[in-house]
């Protein structure tokens, strides 16, 4: 069995926006850096000097997700593009439907089930911080705000820029990578390995 790295699940307790060039994470924010507004908006990724990725030559686009299937889309992207696996998104959808008696294409993946669902396919560990995770070649499954009430949208942080501090993530709904301050993310799931 070949083991690969991916990172998973510890909720971030606050969001902050900071000035400067450091990645904005709870473990490196001083009170002087905290702003009253989140001032960083995601921008479409474009290659820059200082980009660091979990894998070199990672595709910056992907197939657009099926509605409500951001989690399973990101799982397929992580397995196939980051780790070189071959699992089709349909396998994740079928497993979730049979195990949790719920169709993720209608209901999405419940926050109550996301941890056991992801850990069935990926070996996970506690989130530390984005820079350390990416430097260790561990992508970070995380969430951003959703326009759907009482829900979040799942994305995969796959890099950062060492000059600007921006986190780089794949968004399955938009089917391409974006750059943003890491304070934009809602929660972090350290995915350390995939199981095959």
Predicted regions and their residues:
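Sec-dependent signal peptide recognition
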Residues: 2-9
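Conserved active-site-adjacent core of cysteine acyl-enzyme catalytic domains
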Residues: 79-81, 90-196
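Intrinsically disordered, low-complexity peptide-like regions
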Residues: 3, 25-26, 169
């Amino acid at each position: 069995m070949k083991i690969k790295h991916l990172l998973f699940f510890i909720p971030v307790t606050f969001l902050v926006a900071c000035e400067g060039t450091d990645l904005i994470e709870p473990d490196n924010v001083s009170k002087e850096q905290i702003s009253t507004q989140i001032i960083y908006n995601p921008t479409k990724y474009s290659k820059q000097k200082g980009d660091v990725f979990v894998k070199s030559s990672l595709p910056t686009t992907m197939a657009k997700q099926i509605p409500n299937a951001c989690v399973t889309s990101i799982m397929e992207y992580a397995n196939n593009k980051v780790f070189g696996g071959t699992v089709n998104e349909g396998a994740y959808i079928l497993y979730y439907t049979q195990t949790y008696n719920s169709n993720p294409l209608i209901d999405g993946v419940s926050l109550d089930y996301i941890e056991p669902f992801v850990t069935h396919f990926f070996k996970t560990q506690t989130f530390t911080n984005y820079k350390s995770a990416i430097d260790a070649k561990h992508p970070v499954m995380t969430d951003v705000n959703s326009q759907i009430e009482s829900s979040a949208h799942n994305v995969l942080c796959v890099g950062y820029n060492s000059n600007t501090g921006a986190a780089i993530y794949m968004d399955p709904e938009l089917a391409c990578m974006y750059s943003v301050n890491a304070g934009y993310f809602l929660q972090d799931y350290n995915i350390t390995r995939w199981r095959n």
